[in-house]
């Protein structure tokens, strides 16, 4: 059962929604669609609704992914919902998600701007890449990200950086083990991923000494809480977006200002001390494009800042919390932990630390990571918008319909996954002789990072972060917890987080760092 957090602001939103609905009864209740196809019987089935608000009460239930899963199991995998007069289609089937992400990818490549726009905010303004419309700016920025940061060649160039950070992380765990101190896995993983992201995109860590690193981590956490509030507020429909802005404007601008001050300082450092051509980071590349009047696309200073905010949030939070979930699953399933450790010791040995280059030779580790992402996708709800009317699963989807793809439900669908709620990495150990269509069927229902053109461009980096972190913690340590099992309760937030911090004590078993130091005095 999930832990649900209800604060005053969310209650206030709900009260305002009800008051607003009374004043707007005639406008919303009697509005008829002008699309003749909507008057046919081609729409997806719809569960019972309430007068005026439609299915709003279902959309505001938390945690959303579990609420949506319950609705779909009762009424079907493709459902037509309504928040006032706003059409919404809920998708809980892998085959229908495939139609959206592949067959009709261009039609659904635009993300519905559920979060209100504040022009002066680098957090929820119009400068971001993630929520940008599909067009020249989005294509240009994605190309830059792939070629300069997230592509295979770029990842190979920054491998040494991540290797050093992994050793620092491992040394910290050995220090905790020596002192018999408890580790908050989520917090320590957030530090590791934040250090990696910062060094990869701007050439240096955020300083722990002057509080800069803690400031970034705090901003990431605060940003995610604001996204949660806005997504819940925005489910009432486009008509209430301005209301949402008025409720949270002070918080948004405060966080945006803190991001702006931090990033402006970093930008000025790069401008005053530009890196040499052979040692350039992402910030250097972006500043060069910003200053180049002949660039393929002219980007602004605020767009650079907004991109870095998105990289901080996406790169830091996703890997940190997914690793926390997977370690909890491994501790709760000691037989799987044992098998994984045996694989690592067979391939890597005991005298050196696991490396990124080992991952391809560790199929069971890959399966463990995939199974963890299947059960605990960081973003369980994916949102798209229909640019034009089309048919999905034989049903008509009207233009401008908001599509909610419940990735959580798709990856726990009992029609597609055997024992869907159980942690079984073996399901991803696909034998080479298995038919190709079986492999495709597996991939069809596996969407932890989304899919299509709007799929997460940092998928490969995410697998690397999570894989080597899990590998290190399993290779070098046993883990002691209070009680027999890790508590697996979820929060009621928009991202899938553990309700209770995953705290455990590392117990050193082998120290490949000591072996390395003895060979390299």
What residues fall within each predicted segment?
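C-terminal helix/juxtamembrane-tail motif
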Residues: 1-9, 19-20, 288, 402, ...
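Terminal signal-anchor or tail-anchor transmembrane helices
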Residues: 2-37, 464
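Cytochrome P450 substrate-recognition site 1
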Residues: 36-59, 65-161, 185, 189-196, ...
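Conserved cytochrome P450 K-helix E-x-x-R motif and the immediately C-terminal K′/meander segment
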Residues: 55-76, 261, 269, 355-395, ...
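Cytochrome P450 heme-thiolate monooxygenase catalytic core
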Residues: 112-122, 156-323, 339, 491-493
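Cytochrome P450 heme-thiolate "Cys pocket" and heme-binding signature region
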Residues: 309, 430-466, 491
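Cytochrome P450 heme-binding "Cys pocket" and the immediately downstream C-terminal segment
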Residues: 334-336, 459-499
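Conserved cytochrome P450 K-helix/beta-meander segment immediately N-terminal to the heme-binding cysteine loop
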Residues: 359, 405-437, 520-521
